[in-house]
UniProtKB/Swiss-Prot annotation:
Residue sites binding ATP per the record: 232
Keyword annotations from UniProtKB, A to Z: Aminoacyl-tRNA synthetase, ATP-binding, Cytoplasm, Ligase, Nucleotide-binding, Protein biosynthesis, RNA-binding
UniProt name for this protein: Tyrosine--tRNA ligase
Motif ('KMSKS' region): 229-233
Task performed by this protein: Catalyzes the attachment of tyrosine to tRNA(Tyr) in a two-step reaction: tyrosine is first activated by ATP to form Tyr-AMP and then transferred to the acceptor end of tRNA(Tyr).
Length: 418
């Protein structure tokens, strides 16, 4: 099975400009290719991971990746299938975000070894050197307004309005392809299926300005089995930065993937062989309640993104919280595992009587209910049941001198911080 056949078997090929020519190029020699990442935030997220891992698969097959950080295009904003104009960021912010994204990409691509080691480029380096007049004369003249307006990504915005700034975005992305082809012999661009219009602007410019053929391959935008856009948890993006989405939160995200999606996602998001995945699928279908596919997915992706130690920690947090063994976890581990539960910062004037604190921290709705909860054995401090109405919280209840975990019943948690 050649690399293109494997990508197809994994469900990673959505569209290509000329499949036969692309397969020929990929099987006959080394292809230089690029994927672009606009710094629209200070971190990449799961939505980017499909293209990143596809790029890594091609590198493992001997081809040479260029990772383009859009320091210039990030200043403009991509209108593709967006309902409204993006807010423009300052140059300083975009350049700072660009540096962070560069660091994240080095986790996945090999920038050190071999003749196909990855290269990092930033389109701010060339766009900052081109005058507006030169850009219009040397690039803009190759694009008709009719051609630009025919793009689906632009059509959707015509009625609601699109600025010239965003309208020109596709020409800038097209010029990226031309520049990388001219300087580095890059002949293939990879990106999400929503980028098709912008990406083919590059092949158009190559054809008209340099009489060369470029290839485009899009990867699918991933949705779950209900059709919902994939990569968000409770409406929030799942970030690759551990400070924005902890390894534990990412682990839980994958653990909660629906059965109908789990095997498909193993093909897309892991480097397990297709034979290994087929074996997992057989075992998974025989005992779905054991969630083997989800557990494997969580292990593989968290290890890939954050490393084996982070995976082991996420697994330990999961197991200890499930068993109620709060004291077996550090304060930092508890912050990860209980990041979504109510948090109350204890004030110096607060009463440390347990009944009072249950009401103050919002764990019990009233003192009467709080007393009943304590007497009925429904209150746990750091996993230990407390039934003393006169119990006073003390330093002994602080884990690592930072926090106390109170549980009411089986599932209602609150974290007291000091």
């Amino acid at each position: 099975m050649n690399i293109f056949e494997e990508l197809k078997a994994r469900g990673l090929v959505f569209q290509t400009t000329d499949e036969q020519a692309l397969v020929k190029a990929l099987t006959e020699g080394q292809v230089s290719y690029y994927t672009g990442y606009d710094p629209t935030a200070d971190s990449l997220h799961l939505g980017h991971l499909v293209a990143i891992l596809t790029s890594r698969r091609l590198q493992l097959a001997g081809h040479k990746p260029y990772a383009l950080v859009g320091g210039a295009t990030g200043l403009i904003g991509d209108p593709s299938f967006k309902d409204a104009e993006r807010s423009l960021q300052t140059k300083e912010t975009v350049l700072e975000w660009s540096d962070k994204i560069k660091g994240q990409l080095s986790t996945f691509l090999d920038f050190e070894n071999g003749d196909n080691k990855a290269e990092l480029v930033n389109n701010y380096d060339w766009f900052s050197q081109i005058s507006f007049i030169d850009f219009l004369r040397d690039v803009g003249k190759y694009f008709t307004v009719n051609y630009m307006m025919s793009k689906d990504s632009v059509k959707k915005r015509i009625e609601t309005g699109i600025s010239y700034t965003e309208f020109a975005y596709q020409i800038m992305q097209g010029y990226d392809f031309y520049e990388l082809n001219d300087k580095h012999n890059v002949t293939l661009q990879i990106g999400g299926s929503d980028q098709w219009g912008n990406m083919t602007a590059g092949t158009e410019l190559l054809r008209k300005k340099a009489d060369k053929t470029g290839h485009v391959m899009t990867v699918p935008l991933i949705t779950d089995s209900t059709g919902k856009k994939f990569g968000k948890s409770e409406g929030n993006a799942v970030w690759l930065d551990a400070d924005k989405t902890s390894p534990y939160e990412m682990y839980q995200f994958w653990l909660n993937v629906m059965d109908d999606d789990a095997v498909r996602f193993l093909k897309i998001f892991t480097f397990l062989s297709l034979d290994e995945i087929a074996e997992i699928e057989t075992q998974f279908n025989a005992a779905r309640h054991e969630r083997l596919a989800q557990k494997t997915l969580a292990r593989e992706v968290v290890t890939l993104v954050h490393g084996e130690e982070a995976y082991k920690q996420a697994l330990n947090i999961t197991e200890q919280l499930f068993a109620g063994n709060i004291k077996n976890l550090s304060a930092n581990e508890l912050k990860q595992g209980l990041s979504n539960v109510p948090n109350y910062h204890v004030q110096s004037e607060d009463s440390l009587n347990l009944v009072d604190m249950l009401v103050t921290a919002g764990i019990s709705p009233s003192k009467r209910q709080a007393r009943e909860d304590v007497q009925n054995g429904a209150i746990y401090i750091n996993g230990d049941r407390v039934q003393d109405l006169d119990y006073q919280l003390s330093n002994d209840d602080k884990i690592d001198d930072q926090l106390t975990v109170i549980r009411r019943g089986k599932k209602k948690y609150a974290v007291l911080t000091y």
